[in-house]
């Protein structure tokens, strides 16, 4: 069995997960550090956590194997990676799958965790973005002075977003 962890900002439609359904346990955890690292409005935290619970319930309803750690769990205040470590030990997991982690600090922390625990980590391109990291790095390597406007113009042209048939932008201006 493998583990697929889903972070709170990765509540993507089920079609992105279906191919992992049969051989993965899906792990989600409400995280104390995420709720407290910055002062957030209580309703924002409530919305965030209720969205996660709803997504986990949806996965369970669709016959996914889900392990979910709630705010009332004795593990709630433990570091997120301690929660992951607990499940990989109890389920004898050697391989983890996830979407790309957008938070660079947490991604680096997770890479170190994977290395330290001798795990295989399969990273999937995040459906959160139109462009892959490789495409963006390719753009940066080709432009001495990168500008987001130039990058997005190229992306619109490549993906034909808000473009007329003649190659000009809808509305006439970039």
Positions of the model-derived regions?
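Acidic-and-aromatic substrate-binding clefts and catalytic sites of carbohydrate-active enzymes
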Residues: 72-78
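Beta-rich, aromatic/charged-enriched effector core domains that present basic-aromatic interfaces
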Residues: 79-174
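N-terminal beta-strand-loop-alpha-helix module at the start
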Residues: 1-71
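Short strand-loop junctions, especially beta-strand C-caps/beta-turns
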Residues: 71-72, 101
């Amino acid at each position: 069995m493998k583990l697929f962890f889903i972070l709170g900002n990765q509540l993507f439609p089920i079609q992105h997960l279906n191919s992992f359904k049969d051989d993965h346990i899906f792990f989600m955890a409400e995280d104390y550090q995420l709720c407290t690292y910055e002062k957030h409005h209580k309703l924002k935290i409530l919305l965030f956590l209720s969205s996660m619970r709803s997504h986990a319930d949806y996965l369970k309803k669709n016959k996914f194997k889900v392990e979910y750690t709630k705010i009332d769990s004795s593990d709630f205040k433990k570091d997120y990676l301690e929660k992951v470590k607990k499940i990989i030990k109890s389920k004898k997991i050697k391989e983890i799958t996830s979407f790309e982690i957008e938070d660079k600090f947490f991604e680096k922390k997770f890479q170190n965790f994977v290395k330290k625990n001798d795990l295989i980590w399969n990273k999937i391109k995040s459906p959160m973005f139109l462009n892959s990291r490789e495409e963006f790095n390719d753009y940066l390597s080709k432009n001495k002075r990168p500008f987001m406007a130039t990058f997005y113009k190229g992306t619109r042209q490549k993906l034909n977003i808000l473009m007329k048939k003649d190659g000009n932008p809808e509305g006439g201006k970039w």
